[in-house]
């Protein structure tokens, strides 16, 4: 896709165009998803409400690629980063699913010193982090790295010494913003290094397991994450497909949502082929892909 103009909102920038998301009243964390736009667009405009003296470091966007810096009064309210989908679930069924996942990870031997994982920012995934944290503390196990998007639950693993590093591509609350700003072991990454299938530094395949959601899963372990059974588009896929290249891909879903089955004969929209899905966990139990 040829990009004519890229407009990048940056919570901090200098007059040369070096920019980051770590400081200022609008701090949101990191700008990794805008990196490709800044490098490939014909014209790049950085918009900021916080012009700082050169150099603005660390520079997540390099001024060498920026044509213009525009100062405005306010970029927005960073507290709105948090949404209802980035809260730990209160549902007994979903908490049971999370408990099953953490138990599987422990009993299968995946949870060991030096392991790595990614859990998303949905309610079940956040509960998995909580339960996994308890099991790691009980057994004295420390991860080498965990992969964000981060919330305070992932940050707690770093601050409690349960992981050496958090490698992050997206932040979902102000605790994560603070952590990345203040803790050198909370590292910002870009899609080039984390999820680019063609990138030599792609570390998605280094993850020992990932926990993901889905809108539908069929009997052949194929998964849909972008539509419901009515076929209407819900949202973008994001990095979901790239996560499937982990060593163990776990889909944690309820059997039903609003009385509509999540486990179906055939998915409405194929987003992830069954050959890349290893485990499906619902409140009714654990299904392991025989392939």
Language model features: what each stretch is:
Residues 1-116, 127-136, 143-144, 153-291:
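Conserved phosphate- and dinucleotide-binding cores of soluble alpha/beta proteins
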Residues 148:
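Active-site histidine-anchored catalytic micro-motif
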Residues 120-126:
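Core structural elements
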């Amino acid at each position: 896709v040829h990009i004519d103009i890229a407009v990048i909102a940056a919570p901090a920038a200098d007059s040369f165009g070096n920019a980051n998301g770590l400081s200022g009243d609008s701090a949101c964390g990191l700008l990794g998803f805008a990196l490709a736009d800044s490098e490939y667009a014909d014209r790049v405009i950085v918009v900021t409400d916080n012009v700082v003296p050169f150099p603005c470091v660390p520079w997540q966007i390099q001024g060498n690629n920026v044509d213009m810096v525009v100062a405005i009064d306010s970029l927005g309210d960073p507290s709105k980063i948090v949404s209802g989908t980035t809260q730990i679930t209160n549902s007994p069924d979903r908490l049971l699913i999370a408990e099953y996942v953490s138990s599987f990870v422990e009993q299968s031997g995946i949870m060991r010193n030096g392991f790595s994982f990614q859990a998303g920012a949905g309610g079940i995934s956040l509960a998995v982090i909580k339960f996994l944290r308890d099991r790691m503390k009980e057994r004295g196990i420390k991860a080498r790295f965990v992969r964000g998007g981060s919330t305070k639950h992932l940050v707690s693993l770093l601050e409690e010494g349960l992981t050496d590093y958090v490698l992050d591509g997206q932040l979902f609350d102000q605790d994560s913003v603070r952590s990345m700003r203040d803790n050198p072991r909370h590292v910002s990454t870009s899609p080039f290094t984390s999820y680019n299938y063609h990138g030599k530094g792609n570390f998605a395949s280094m993850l020992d397991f990932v926990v993901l959601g889905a809108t539908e899963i069929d009997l052949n372990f194929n998964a849909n994450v972008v539509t419901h059974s009515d076929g209407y588009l819900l949202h973008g896929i994001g990095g979901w497909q790239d996560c499937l290249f982990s060593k163990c891909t776990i889909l944690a879903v309820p059997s039903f949502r609003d009385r509509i089955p999540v486990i179906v004969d055939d998915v409405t929209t194929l987003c992830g082929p069954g050959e890349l899905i290893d485990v499906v966990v619902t409140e009714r139990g654990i299904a392991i892909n025989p392939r």
